[in-house]
Curated annotation (Swiss-Prot):
This is Heterochromatin protein 1. Residues 1-24, 47-145 are annotated as: Disordered. It comes from Drosophila melanogaster (Fruit fly). The record marks Y24, W45, Y48 as: Histone H3K9me2 binding. Its main location: nucleus. Gene3D superfamilies: 2.40.50.40. Changing T105A: In strain: NC322, NC358 and NC359. PROSITE patterns: CHROMO_1, CHROMO_2. The lineage of its organism: Eukaryota, Metazoa, Ecdysozoa, Arthropoda, Hexapoda. One of its GO terms (molecular function) is RNA polymerase II C-terminal domain binding. GO terms for biological process: chromosome organization; heterochromatin formation; mitotic cell cycle; negative regulation of DNA-templated transcription; pericentric heterochromatin formation; positive regulation of DNA-templated transcription; positive regulation of FACT complex assembly; positive regulation of transcription by RNA polymerase II. Residues 24-82, 147-205 form the Chromo domain. It comes from the Eukaryota. The gene is Su(var)205.
Length: 206
């Protein structure tokens, strides 16, 4: 927009030397850019809508006060932005610390789970060598999975808890099953297991 020439009288009455320039007042500077090596400012003109804003070269402007104020404000904003970028916020530091702590805890837990469990010594008495290849007693048994028991291979007193080593059909590994479950699911097989291991003694009386 810059400066416009206003000719209130006709050109016939006024010569070129007498042409008068009417300067438009700058309300505020909105933005700044460098184009082809020259600094230009995006101006809001006083008394005109935003749609009339224009880019004007610095050397065409006569509003040094507004330019100085805008440049000072722009430098302050740049310093503030640089300061925030260089120094992360306390919340970001806290999240980073928390993340490291969580990672350390996770690593420690993983290492602990990978460590072999120490042997329990002679707390449990094993009656057969087949227990070396057994599935330990857990919350679920082969019965819970719908398997059919084929044979009781042995029994074990595990910390005062009687368990049976049961071979299920279609499964390679035998499984330790609590006696309470076996007594309910396969009572006849349990009785047969005991009968096979009973020794009968008779006293010969003269």
């Amino acid at each position: 927009m810059g400066k416009k020439i206003d000719n209130p009288e006709s050109s016939a009455k006024v010569s070129d030397a007498e042409e008068e320039e009417e300067e438009y007042a700058v309300e505020k500077i909105i933005d700044r850019r460098v184009r082809k090596g020259k600094v230009e400012y995006y101006l809001k003109w006083k008394g005109y809508p935003e749609t009339e804003n224009t880019w004007e070269p610095e050397n065409n402007l006569d509003c040094q006060d507004l330019i100085q104020q805008y440049e000072a404000s722009r430098k302050d904003e740049e310093k503030s932005a640089a300061s925030k970028k260089d120094r992360p916020s306390s919340s970001a530091k806290a999240k980073e610390t928390q993340g490291r702590a969580s990672s350390s805890t996770s690593t420690a837990s993983k290492r602990k789970s990978e460590e072999p469990t120490a042997p329990s010594g002679n707390k449990s008495k094993r009656t057969t060598d087949a227990e070396q290849d057994t599935i330990p007693v857990s919350g679920s048994t082969g019965f819970d999975r719908g398997l059919e028991a084929e044979k009781i291979l042995g029994a074990s007193d595990n910390n005062g808890r009687l368990t049976f080593l049961i071979q299920f059909k279609g499964v390679d590994q035998a499984e330790m099953v609590p006696s309470s479950v076996a007594n309910e699911k396969i009572p006849r097989m349990v009785i047969h297991f005991y009968e096979e291991r009973l020794s009968w003694y008779s006293d010969n009386e003269d």
